[in-house]
A protein has these predicted regions:
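C-terminal beta-sandwich/jelly-roll accessory domains of carbohydrate-active enzymes
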Residues: 136-168
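Loop/helix patches that line or flank the sugar-binding groove of alpha-linked glycan CAZymes
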Residues: 1-129, 135-140
Length: 168
């Protein structure tokens, strides 16, 4: 996301910003709204590496600003990190292609007591997969009984407690 209104190109959001500023709404409050609702935040150039403009172009500028985190968050860095988001998704896609239960299995949502955890099963024939995801910012404890299962995919180096899900 961008902190300066000058970095945004979305005409509708720029008009909203102008109208709300005229009403006296503070810049910081409007930027918080833009962070969550403006399409420009998802339109920034792909960050391929840590070269200028994230390796997206050798030109003098991009049509919209590159996220300043491109020095640390980019494809080249993610490819070398076994626990990066890119590496995790590659593993997840490989697992999905290999296990038909993840493609064709019947989906059953599991009501969970923790608001950050999404839990469900996929079942087909004699195969069953339990999927637990913590979409919060903090570790989250789940209370589901796990029997005869095998952990096949995770995004942390070390699992100390199988009932404590780390944040994604």
């Amino acid at each position: 996301y961008y902190l300066n209104i000058e970095d945004y190109n979305d005409v509708g959001m720029l008009k909203l910003y102008e109208i709300e500023r005229e009403k006296g709404v503070p810049h910081d409050q409007l930027i918080e709204i833009l962070k969550k609702t403006c399409r420009d935040n998802g339109r920034s150039p792909m960050q391929w590496d840590d070269t200028p403009y994230g390796g997206f172009t050798k030109g003098e500028q991009t049509w919209i600003g590159v996220n300043p985190n491109y020095l640390e968050v980019n494809v080249a860095e993610q490819e070398t990190n076994e626990y990066s988001v890119l590496s995790f998704y590659k593993k997840m896609i490989t697992l999905r292609k290999k296990e038909k239960v993840l493609i064709y299995g019947k989906y059953d949502y599991i009501q969970n007591q923790h608001p950050s955890i999404v839990a469900y099963t996929r079942t087909i024939e004699h195969s069953k997969a339990l999927i637990l995801c913590n979409f919060g910012k903090e570790p989250a404890q789940h209370t589901l009984a796990i029997h005869d299962g095998e952990l096949v995919l995770h995004n942390y180096k070390k699992i100390d407690d199988e009932y404590l899900l780390q944040p994604y």
